[in-house]
């Protein structure tokens, strides 16, 4: 027993001495394995593992993909996965912030009576058979819209257009007409389910118009026997426009928009009293976007129609617009395209006219 106890007492220190060695022996392969990348990094610093950067906060989109189809960022003009394509004759029922420009040029013809020289100083020009008078047209516009709340927005539109007679007879009859207008409006909108959105809008428009009436000026000069004749007719119009707007997106590639408005313009002519008119406006649009179906073809088309009709005995003059648009749809924050507008209207409220205009349209959404 004493011998066994002496042997155990001798083995305990030996075991205690072996434990650190065994621990070092097990750790050696791991250290050797871990040292391989370190050695490689020492030989080639480019292969060294780089520390991972901090993860992007939730909800933050890579700036390189802002507005593109690859992101989950939802545009304020998006409904049920469909990003609506704008048209200059349609008001969208979306609360959004955007800046837009449009510029267009075109031509057309107006139908009116021909001028017959009578030789009578009291009535030097008399109307003859109707004929067509060609004209050229120019137009521009700036659109600024601000999203105040999720359901409330305000907008400011500034624009103008001009019609110029083309040719000697057209210059005499049509002359030159220049119009400018500023539109200030507010809109309250709200979603109805997933596929619909409705809005109520109220706009106030003010704009002057200048008409250079060459034929009337010549007739007045002969009739009055004086060259001091004012050939410039000036008017100013103040218009109230309340309306209801709606949008429907049954599929991500298809959308429809509808506008119904009441129009009440009050016009003041130079040297005469004011007069008021009433009218109504109905406009609709259907747009088709290829991007959700074929991402390699980021283009869309829109077809829109707008009718301005008289209301009551003192109604406005009827105007029809038929609009076709081709737009780039690769970015949700950009609407860029060409619009072709066919318009039936009256120049100077007397000459029935038909005109075709090509417009360049750009709108950026923030």
Ranges and model annotations:
Residues 1-8:
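N-terminal secretory signal peptides that target proteins for export/translocation
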Residues 8-16:
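Sec-dependent signal peptide recognition
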Residues 20-22:
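N-terminal signal peptide c-region/cleavage motif recognized by signal peptidases
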Residues 29-33, 37-251, 256-265, 273-328, ...:
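Transmembrane beta-barrel domains of Gram-negative outer membranes and organellar outer membranes
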